């Protein structure tokens, strides 16, 4: 970030926010390439990209020269006779420019966030990026709340909504026109946003740009929570957003209070409960409150109206589910979570009188949902739809050890992620499916029976599926036979993404 600020110490940029000329600077594409190698969570496959000739500085210089010489920057894509900027090697040039454009549009947000963090002296904790860090928060807060709302964030039904979202931040009209060009180009070719899904699907060639657009859209959807939180609580609350791809946003709190305060002056009395907690991951969020059913219904009503009025889109009311925590389990981040009432009888004796008191204690429970996991395994061809293990097709040139290592790595990843489950019987079933699928795969390769193969390789195959979690539990509870390790939860604060089973190869 210090390096980026050094490039941008220009009075004209700070005063007029002219981002468009930066596309003609070579260092922008170097920054985009560096971010793709080091800063991207979703681009792990780009480790060897530095040896790719497409990323050489010579090609970037030729691209910038072509942009300088082009009379009309954007020409008709349908005109095959022209060989201008887009017509010649259109896909590659669009990809490189969109990567540089993604770095440029992040500049206003990044600089404002850095200055905000320096003023407030807010420390950065990398562990807060972990997905598992959400669940200790649930354990601490949800047991004291009454109602929970499952919310699917509405998707933009028109591309212009994404452009209008950035108009308040970016005042450079040519940059916004270029953004429209990229959106319409990829809408026609890749179907950037589909109405059947609740979140955006990003083109593999332009993940950074589309992830930035989706995060900006989600930030606008969540802006109402900042305002209502400030109005409903007597405590001063500060907020800032830190998103993936090192894309940072600084909350427009003051402007938001002025706008929404004029539009909703008579509804603020409905939000007096300070115990409201909001958590989001990707396109799904959880809103929990200690208030009454009436209050939580009002939250739903005003959220739907806010999204309809502010984004000019129809947000279906059935995308927000309201339930009581004690009677409902909600699915979030691969876990089926709920708050259970555990009754305990306590015997109290005072002098000659004895009393039996039955107390109910709320406890946060996390369960591994077996049906969705079996569905994922079936999709990846480890088992059929009913969970019966089948042989997985692999390349014939793979050795037995490579096949066993791949199965073992998938099993360890699942065990590592679902280590926070309070009931691990379902997880043991998943391990059994993977182990037997591995045995069927190897027996098919050697044209043998599963029984004969397991008898010959049983102990070695079993060792590959021992997880780090079981080793940690043996260290934590070595001499406590009363503890049941299969009920102990362990949250790892180094998990920042969910691995797709289908991409294990």
UniProtKB/Swiss-Prot annotation:
**Top-rank taxon, per record:** Eukaryota
Q: Which UniProt keywords apply?
A: Chloroplast, mRNA processing, Plastid, RNA-binding, tRNA processing
Q: Which residues form the signal peptide?
A: none
The name this protein goes by in its record: Maturase K
Q: What InterPro entries does the record tag this protein with?
A: Domain_X, Maturase_MatK, Maturase_MatK_N
| Keyword Mitochondrion attributed | no
Which regions span the lipid bilayer?
Answer: none
Where in the cell? Plastid, Chloroplast
Q: Name one Pfam family in it.
A: MatK_N
User: What's this protein's family per the entry?
Assistant: Belongs to the intron maturase 2 family. MatK subfamily.
GO terms (molecular function) for this protein are: RNA binding
Disulfide bonding pattern of the chain: none
What this chain does, per the entry, is described as:
Usually encoded in the trnK tRNA gene intron. Probably assists in splicing its own and other chloroplast group II introns.
Originating organism: Calycanthus floridus var. glaucus
Any one GO CC term of the record: chloroplast
* Gene Ontology BP, a term: mRNA processing
């Amino acid at each position: 970030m210090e390096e980026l600020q050094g490039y941008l110490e220009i009075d004209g940029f700070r005063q007029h926010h002219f981002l468009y000329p930066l596309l003609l600077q070579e260092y922008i594409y170097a920054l985009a390439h560096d971010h793709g190698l080091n800063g991207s969570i979703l681009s792990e496959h780009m480790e060897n990209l530095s040896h790719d000739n497409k990323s050489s500085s010579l090609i970037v210089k030729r691209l910038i020269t072509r942009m300088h010489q082009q009379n009309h920057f954007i020409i008709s894509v349908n005109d095959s006779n022209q060989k201008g900027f887009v017509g010649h090697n259109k896909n590659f040039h669009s990809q490189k420019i969109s990567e540089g454009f993604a770095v440029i549009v992040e500049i206003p947000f990044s600089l404002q966030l850095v200055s905000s963090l320096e003023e407030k002296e807010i420390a950065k904790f990398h562990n807060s990026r972990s997905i598992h860090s959400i669940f200790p928060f649930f354990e601490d807060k949800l047991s004291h709340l009454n109602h929970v709302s499952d919310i699917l964030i509405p998707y933009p039904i028109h591309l212009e909504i994404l452009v209008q979202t950035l108009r308040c931040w970016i005042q450079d009209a040519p940059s916004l026109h270029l953004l429209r060009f990229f959106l319409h180009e990829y809408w026609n070719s890749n179907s950037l946003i589909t109405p059947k899904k609740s979140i955006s699907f990003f083109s593999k060639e332009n993940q950074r740009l589309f992830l930035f657009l989706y995060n900006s859209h989600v930030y606008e959807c969540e802006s109402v929570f900042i305002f209502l939180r400030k109005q409903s609580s007597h405590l001063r609350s500060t907020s800032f957003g830190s998103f993936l791809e090192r894309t940072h946003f600084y909350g427009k709190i003051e402007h938001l209070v002025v706008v929404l305060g004029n539009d909703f002056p008579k509804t603020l009395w409905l939000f007096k409960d300070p115990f409201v907690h909001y958590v989001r991951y990707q396109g799904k969020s959880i809103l929990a409150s200690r208030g009454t059913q009436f209050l939580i219904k009002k939250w739903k009503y005003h959220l739907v109206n806010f999204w309809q009025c502010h984004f000019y889109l129809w947000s279906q009311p059935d995308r927000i589910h309201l339930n009581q925590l004690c009677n409902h389990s909600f699915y979030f981040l691969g876990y089926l979570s709920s708050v259970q009432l555990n009754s305990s009888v306590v015997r109290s004796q005072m002098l000659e009188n004895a009393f039996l008191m039955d107390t109910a204690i709320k406890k946060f429970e996390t369960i591994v949902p077996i049906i969705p996991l079996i569905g994922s395994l079936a999709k990846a061809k480890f088992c059929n739809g009913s969970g019966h293990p089948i042989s997985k097709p692999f390349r014939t040139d793979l050795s037995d050890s490579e096949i066993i290592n791949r199965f073992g790595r998938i099993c360890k990843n699942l065990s590592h992620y679902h280590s926070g489950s309070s009931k691990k019987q379902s997880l043991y079933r998943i391990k059994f499916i993977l182990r037997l699928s591995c045995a069927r795969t190897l027996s098919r390769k050697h044209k043998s029976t599963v029984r004969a193969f397991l008898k010959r390789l049983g102990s070695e195959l079993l060792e590959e599926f021992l997880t780090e979690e079981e080793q940690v539990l043996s260290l934590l509870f070595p001499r406590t036979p009363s503890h049941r390790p299969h009920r102990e939860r362990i949250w790892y604060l180094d998990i920042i993404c969910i691995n797709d089973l289908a991409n294990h190869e």
